[in-house]
Amino acid sequence: QMCIRDRSYTCRQVIDRLHRFYTQRKVQPYGHYAASAAGGDEMDEARERLAAIMNVATDELSFGPSTSQNTYVLAQAFAETLQQGDAVIVTDQDHEANSGAWRRLANRGMEIREWHVDPESGQLELDSLAAILDEKVKLVCFPHCSNIVGQENPVARIVAMAHDVGAVTCVDGVSMAPHGFPDIGALGTDIYLFSSYKTYGPHQGIMVVRQDLADRLANQAHFFNADARVKRFTPAGPDHAQVAAAAGMADYVDALYAHHVGGDADPAARARVVTAMK
């Protein structure tokens, strides 16, 4: 027999919320009648609860169709913000979602620097990063965890190194988030990306962009959404039902915490306890 380990299935809490939205809320949300208002409230609930779990502000979390598409939108925002000659660091430990879009910035006059893995271990070494890190670097992109060699990279240390030269960081958490929700506040990264369908949720990309950076990057949405952080990097309308259903991911964390531990704790603390169960 062959045992194949794939992504997580969607939890019942998400499925129930998705079903409820499609059968009771399938109208334009945020209107002034019951079904519309309830739909908007459920979308807001998902953002608020997931942001609390990850220890970030509510308006720092955005939803998109996938992590790959979120990254392409961010790359376009950086392309309109960076200057020719600015440097961007990418790795060969990343999968394409967090490297291809950034490498294309070379077509806009940015310098792309490669942080190569050790050829024997497949790991990213901090000394190798230090050798290519200077004040020309404006963005450092790297994975939280490699889905090939399984290395969990020291995110907080890498972020500190990047910040020391004035660069911001973009962490691909697609391979890490299935093992537990990240405490992004503690990690300190400027951008964190992962896919909710690999974390018991609907097929959405979840993108955290910290407030200061979000306000500096070029708006990618309609001009009338430019002042709304949760809309700046969502060029098209969101999938209302899937965004609302993402609150079921928080329901699932709460259910696991209540069953195994119980008692009072803030959302981020509950998520840390559930993550430790892995």
Regions found by a protein language model. Give the residues of each.
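Pyridoxal 5′-phosphate
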Residues: 1, 5-278
